């Protein structure tokens, strides 16, 4: 990049003389945060395995038994029902978001598998999946897919601030 303004030696000397008595101010009003570290590179083999897992866990033929009355919800057997209540109340804040608007079922299935794998990799316990309303294809299919995945502990229709009836909050099981 070229400098736009060229100072002559006389102008530079004049500038130095004009600021000679100035003291440096201590900046104490703005907290500077260090930028987040970039994640490690993910091995191509691991990405391929995550894609294979996504197609393995999500079947279009299998129909898990979900409650049809009230909001969409699911809790894996052996998990406390209080977890679903905490999701409903908004006690968990989603750290990752997935928007499925405009995707086909195949694309949505892959993205959902990638989200769950990313949550496990990044140690994210709660995520939000926005399936939208549309023609209700993804709205009906998304809970069926999520109930099949072994790493999903529970999910519930999201509170209004995170999408309401057009989104689901899900809890992911993390390794200790």
UniProtKB/Swiss-Prot annotation:
Keyword Cell wall biogenesis/degradation applies: no
Residues covered by the Smr domain: 98-173
Example GO biological process: rescue of stalled ribosome
Superkingdom assignment: Bacteria
EC nos: 3.1.-.-
Statement: the UniProt record of this protein carries the keyword Membrane: no
Protein role: Acts as a ribosome collision sensor. Detects stalled/collided disomes (pairs of ribosomes where the leading ribosome is stalled and a second ribosome has collided with it) and endonucleolytically cleaves mRNA at the 5' boundary of the stalled ribosome. Stalled/collided disomes form a new interface (primarily via the 30S subunits) that binds SmrB. Cleaved mRNA becomes available for tmRNA ligation, leading to ribosomal subunit dissociation and rescue of stalled ribosomes.
PANTHER family assigned to the protein according to its UniProt record, in alphabetical order: DNA ENDONUCLEASE SMRA-RELATED, UPF0115 PROTEIN YFCN
UniProt similarity note: Belongs to the SmrB family.
Family matches, as NCBIfam families: PRK04946.1
Annotated protein name in UniProt: Ribosome rescue factor SmrB
Native source species: Yersinia pestis
Gene that encodes it: smrB
